């Protein structure tokens, strides 16, 4: 670029500015290069010192050069950052727009009809009127009154053994795991039975834990299969003798833990699969016995425990253990609204002592106003009423979805209902894979979740899953039941359009 000062139309200081800006931006002047002094530049260009000084000040203001006292002006490293920023802002590849989803069978949202917004609004307004309480920060462990209400509720409904002092409140399970993991330094590995909670697993990895999948370990380390049979959880195990018990989670876990030292086991016994299989009491007791023998800490995420449609809720592992050796986690995201970020953790005595030594260093992440509101909401009995209403609604919607599948697909599809949760498993008679169907459905505006293998499902005797048949998980939660049939008609067209 040549500096032309004779053309009219632009101030001379701007031309000097543009000239050096181009030299620096193009790399002809490298970071650290020295510019001519103001006096020398004014002589070379035959300009006044004021004109050159103004141009230099503008370059410095924009980050291209820096003034060093008693030394002069130098090109800055910020130029490289500016170039990188421009490349990032303008060089990002165009992302293909996703198709609009009209029918959402994959959402984890809740049904609007399941929640009494006006009632909750009343409790929030009442909490916001407590001016004096809201002028201070919340208690690091959670508001005392809220923990007292939680303690009473958990004891009544989940047989959890706790006191208000053993409960820690946080904004979501992940925030609580960030408190828990540093207290488990003597344990070096964390095992997960259900790999779908990737966010939790990532936190353990971030804190240096080796993580593994119990099911995968079992399958990769037992190659002695001669005559085999399906175990209680769908895992093949050698038939050592004719009277051998079916292989359950406890056996799989004990075998894995026996070779890994002091470990942590993270599981959701009230929803062992995404579609709602529940760990039986017998397996829970066996697991607790083996965990005590192997010095294994269990983290029980009691997700969706309230949503047992057809049977009474199974007692929590924490309660069955007598309150020792188990960390109990719970959340209100499904019972209330996902946007109400309120979770809680019940610590066993040994970990509670550690928390009390360092708990003051943690700030409370959950809203103080929402804790106050939810405390009174629970005390007035509305949480239990909310559970009854939600269970009735989602049980009816799940049945409605199964009926709609039968009407639309006939003998070309089968449905399976789990013991809990919001999902219906659908098996299709089609040569397409689950992923292919999900991809085509998305293009047609229908969101579904593919299931790639029977191994990811816990198999009960009443369910006979077929290998080779595509399987989809359909959520009955967020979409209105009146739209099920029209959505399934679109899905059927996607699956069988080649057969016409």
Named regions from a protein language model:
Residues 66-68, 162, 448:
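Short beta-strand "wing" residues that participate in macromolecule-binding interfaces
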Residues 110, 269-272, 334, 479:
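Short glycine-rich anion-binding loops that position phosphate/pyrophosphate groups of nucleotides
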């Amino acid at each position: 670029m040549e500096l032309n000062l004779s053309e009219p139309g632009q101030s001379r200081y701007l031309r000097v500015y543009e000239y050096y800006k181009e030299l620096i931006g193009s790399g002809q002047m490298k970071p650290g290069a020295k510019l001519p002094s103001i006096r020398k530049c004014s002589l070379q260009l035959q300009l006044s010192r004021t004109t050159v000084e103004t141009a230099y000040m503008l370059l410095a203001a924009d980050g291209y050069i820096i003034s060093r006292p008693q030394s002069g002006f130098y090109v800055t490293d910020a130029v490289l950052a500016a170039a990188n920023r421009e490349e990032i802002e303008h060089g990002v590849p165009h992302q293909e727009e996703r198709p609009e989803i009209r029918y959402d069978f994959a959402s984890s949202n809740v049904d609007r009809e399941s929640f009494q917004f006006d009632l909750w609004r009343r409790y929030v307004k009442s909490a916001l009127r407590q001016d004096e309480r809201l002028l201070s920060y919340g208690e690091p462990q959670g508001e005392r009154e809220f923990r007292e209400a939680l303690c009473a509720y958990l004891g009544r409904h989940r047989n959890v053994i706790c006191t208000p002092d053993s409960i820690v409140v946080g904004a979501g399970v992940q925030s609580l795991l960030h408190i828990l993991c540093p207290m488990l330094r003597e344990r070096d590995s964390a095992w997960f039975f259900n790999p779908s909670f990737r966010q939790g697993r990532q936190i353990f990895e971030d804190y240096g834990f080796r993580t593994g999948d119990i099911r995968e370990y079992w399958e990769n380390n037992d190659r002695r299969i001669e005559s085999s049979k399906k175990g209680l959880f769908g895992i093949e195990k050698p038939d050592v003798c004719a009277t051998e018990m079916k292989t359950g989670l406890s056996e799989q876990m004990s075998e894995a833990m026996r070779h890994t030292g002091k470990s942590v086991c993270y599981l959701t016994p009230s929803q062992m699969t995404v579609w709602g299989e529940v760990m039986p009491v017998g397996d829970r007791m066996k697991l607790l016995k083996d965990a005590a023998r192997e010095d294994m800490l269990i983290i029980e995420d009691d997700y969706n425990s309230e949503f047992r449609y057809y049977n009474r809720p199974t007692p929590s592992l924490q309660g069955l253990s007598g309150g020792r050796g188990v960390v109990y986690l719970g959340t209100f995201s499904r019972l209330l609204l996902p946007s109400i970020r309120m979770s809680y953790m019940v610590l066993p005595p040994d970990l509670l002592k550690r928390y009390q030594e360092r708990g003051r260093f943690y700030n409370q992440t959950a809203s103080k106003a929402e804790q106050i509101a939810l405390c009174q909401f629970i005390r007035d009995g509305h949480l239990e009423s909310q559970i009854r209403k939600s269970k009735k609604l989602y049980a009816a919607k799940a049945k409605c979805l199964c009926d709609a599948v039968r009407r639309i697909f006939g003998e070309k599809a089968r449905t399976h209902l789990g013991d809990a949760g919001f999902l219906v498993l659908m098996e299709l008679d089609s040569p397409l894979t689950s992923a292919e169907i999900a991809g085509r459905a998305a293009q047609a505006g229908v969101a579904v979740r593919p299931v790639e293998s029977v191994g990811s499902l816990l198999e009960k005797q009443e369910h006979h899953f077929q290998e080779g048949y595509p399987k989809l998980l359909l959520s009955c939660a967020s979409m209105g039941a009146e739209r099920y049939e029209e959505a399934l008609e679109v899905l059927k067209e996607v699956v069988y359009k080649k057969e016409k």
